[in-house]
Amino acid sequence: MFLAVWILYATDRLLDGVGGTAEDMEARHRFHRRHRRGFEIALTSASLALIPLVLAMPATSLRLYIGLAVLLAGWFLVVHRLTRNWRLKLPKELMPGLFCAAAAFIPVWANRGFDHLELACAAIAFGVLIIFNCLCIYAWEHQQMADAHWTTRLGVRYLTQLGVATVLLSLLAIALAGEQMAPIFIATALAATLLLALNQIRGALEPTDLRAASDLVLLTPLLVAPFLR
């Protein structure tokens, strides 16, 4: 999962740097463009390392991942090709939450099915957390919202409320979940709380530092990993 997510992230950053000027790019895009050759070598190596892991997957999980990969490839095509030609506005801050939640929970869905309330709550809470993370980053890096999709503008306008809703959803899930699932929701609630705190002090930090911190808080599952069974 780590390799696949990194491959998608790095590929997305490299595609963002195609055809643009350095002045129009964020710092992370300039970094990936400057070191493009190194990233291409690393991406090739990571892809080769991923092949045996993919082939070892259970057939049910593999079929679901193939379907998700097709949808994701279509999304990349729309974002990096059609939007530039047709000047489309897309809900870029919403889609990572949908794709990440689906990718993270496919193995469990494949083994347990889709009719588990606890699993649905976990997937929704995780997806909303990723969306909240993306909206925070967008709000921190952009002063103007005119070019954003209406869903992004709406999310940024109610950013604090979305963060509070994520925390409350996670707390409700903790109350409903059994002992086995509770640590997952605790990690989600903690990450959302930390993102809310970062948003409150955003004026004291540089955008690059804020982005790094926003990614760091998503590592909260490491804190509860010893309690997962």
Sequence positions of predicted segments:
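Intramembrane alpha-helical segments
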Residues: H35-N111
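Helix-coil boundary and interhelical linker segments in multi-pass alpha-helical membrane proteins
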Residues: M1, L50-L64, A104-I124, L172-P183, ...
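Transmembrane alpha-helical segments that form the membrane-embedded catalytic/substrate-channel core
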Residues: L3-V18, V70-L82, A125-H142, A192-R202
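Extended hydrophobic alpha-helices typical of membrane-associated regions
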Residues: I186-R229
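Functional transmembrane core segments of multi-pass inner-membrane proteins
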Residues: E93-C136, H142
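Glycine/small-residue-rich hydrophobic helix-like segments
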Residues: A148-L198
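Solvent-exposed interhelical
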Residues: Y9-I41, L129-V167
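Small-residue-rich segments of transmembrane alpha-helices in multi-pass membrane proteins
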Residues: H29-R37, E93-W109, L154-T166, A212-F227
